[in-house]
Amino acid sequence: MDHSISPEYNFPAITRCSLSNSLPHRPPSPLPSSADIHRFYNSLSPSAPSVPVSSEMESMEAVEKILNYKFSNKSLLKEAITHTSCTDFPSYERLEFIGDSAIGLAISNYLYLTYPSLEPHDLSLLRAANVSTEKLARVSLNHGLYSFLRRNAPSLDEKVKEFSEAVGKEDDLSVSYGGLVKAPKVLADLFESLAGAVYVDVNFDLQRLWVIFRGLLEPIVTLDDLQKQPQPVSMLFKLCHKHKKRIDIKNWKDGNVSIAVIYLDDELLASGRAENKDIARLIAAKEALRKLSEVFPVEMVIDEDSVEIQLTHAKTKLNEICLKKKWPKPIYSVEEDRSSVQGKRFVCSAKIKITEEKTLYMKGDEQSKIKKAESSSAYHMIRALRKSHYL
């Protein structure tokens, strides 16, 4: 997406604490360029107070231009851009609460319709990547929303500045799992509060909310993005193996919440919490990588044929291949079912009938669960198809 703008564009000054109906249809307003964004964030100082604007209305109108939406209730917009450090007006926390849920549901609907054969596990990973603090913080950063936040917390400026500088140095702008500088939560909170404000202003119309915010969320993280990006858990194991460190990940449930805790040589390193076990592991692994990056270099690379990356999406990928080739869907069968000292072990096979006379068959590796065994057979089927030049 081209984020270039005209040379005369300037960031509006930051608002100090003391801000009719939908806009006619028009193209979205131009975004600030990367240079403009980083010039603004580099000007932030943890010791410098916020600079007042000549008019709160100008600040609010600028936000409306970014959203390409004009609020009927201006108080909602003012509330959405008021941080808790400002005490002269209700803060954005309530709107953030409803915005978080609304954006999550809107993304869920989109993914459900976009990937009709994707399994719930993979849909959860995709949704998490698109509504994570990391993703939404980058959206706020790219659209320059932080400059309009009414705040009285100079320490936030330093965190946002550090994050902005780190993002500016990245080669790949579509980072699905996040970089090594933790995204400031305030950036994601601001985006969610604006989503909540719009959602309330459109009378809780989820479809209208999605129409307004879909463009802001671009590029939306896709299944291919997740497969191509280095996966934090895999990176962590490879990194620790390289430096002869022992890594261990423990998982347990606390009510409906999954908790993942990572130990490095039996010392607590990081933890993560989420509704989904795999997402909790991702959160913990990202935090562990950030901490380890202070000790030794973390290379953001991984073998693209890594089984750990591909197994998660192998069945979905194989379904997509069959659909494209106009083959019937694969048939999975349990070939081996036995018990061992490690518990139950399974081996599954995948079959694809590509013609009346020809059926492709592939067995997978031994796994602890049937679904994983099916994914393993799908993974090996894909590799065999590549080697046999079917793909």
From Swiss-Prot:
It comes from the Eukaryota. It is an enzyme of class 3 (hydrolase). Expressed in seeds, leaves and flower buds. This is Ribonuclease 3-like protein 2. InterPro entries: dsRBD_dom, RNase_III_dom, RNase_III_sf. GO terms for cellular component: cytoplasm; nucleus. Residues 60-203 form the RNase III domain. It comes from Arabidopsis thaliana (Mouse-ear cress).
